[in-house]
Amino acid sequence: MSIEVFNESGYDGVNEEMLIDVLSFALGEMDIHPDAEASIHIVDVDTIADLHVKWLDLEGPTDVMSFPMDELTPGYSRPDGATPGPAMLGDIVLCPEFAAKQATKAGHDLAHELALLTVHGSLHLLGYDHVDPAEEREMFALQNELLADWYDNVEARGVTYQPKPSGAGAFPTAADRLELDEKMEADDSGFGGVES
């Protein structure tokens, strides 16, 4: 996997190596060609708010946005799977300032929140969405499975980014995330609404 990180946020405390690791793991588990490319852009609140309006016509900042490029489907190495070669998956845009507030409300640290959002963004790059309830349940279940498996993989490799968190907020269901979104909307921080 070729993954580039562009940190334009000016926000301290973002572990770019961890973001590359979790994205590489998630895409590998989804059986995406090992030569596929993706990028992670780490931006400030104003930038993600502008992107949110421009691309989704939604006011206010958000935590993560994904911009797919080449349409790929999981299953590269299966005998009956698609055989696409290397391709540009797309861009994941993260806002650590917004994510930090969500992490606090969810009861875990920023690093975990950014790992969760990176997996979430990777699934959007692969065509997953959460528009209807069935899709939402499928996407969040897969997101949580990939994230938990990544923590297990990191531990098995003897790598330490942060401890694997526990509790409902660590591996949220779609309903948990909706509740968190509502808390963020009610927050008087001036961030406004959220749409992942």
UniProtKB/Swiss-Prot annotation:
One of its GO terms (cellular component) is cytoplasm. The keyword Cytoplasm applies. Its cofactor is Zn(2+). It comes from Corynebacterium glutamicum (strain ATCC 13032 / DSM 20300 / JCM 1318 / BCRC 11384 / CCUG 27702 / LMG 3730 / NBRC 12168 / NCIMB 10025 / NRRL B-2784 / 534). It is found in: Cytoplasm. The gene is ybeY. Keywords: Cytoplasm, Endonuclease, Hydrolase, Metal-binding, Nuclease, Ribosome biogenesis, rRNA processing, Zinc. It holds the Pfam family YbeY. InterPro entries: MetalPrtase_cat_dom_sf_prd, YbeY, YbeY_CS. HAMAP family: Endoribonucl_YbeY. GO terms for molecular function: metalloendopeptidase activity; RNA endonuclease activity; zinc ion binding. The keyword Zinc applies. Binds 1 zinc ion. GO terms for biological process: rRNA processing. Zn(2+) binds at residues 120, 124, 130. This is Endoribonuclease YbeY. Single strand-specific metallo-endoribonuclease involved in late-stage 70S ribosome quality control and in maturation of the 3' terminus of the 16S rRNA. PROSITE patterns: UPF0054 (PS01306). It comes from the Bacteria. Its EC number is 3.1.-.-. Belongs to the endoribonuclease YbeY family.
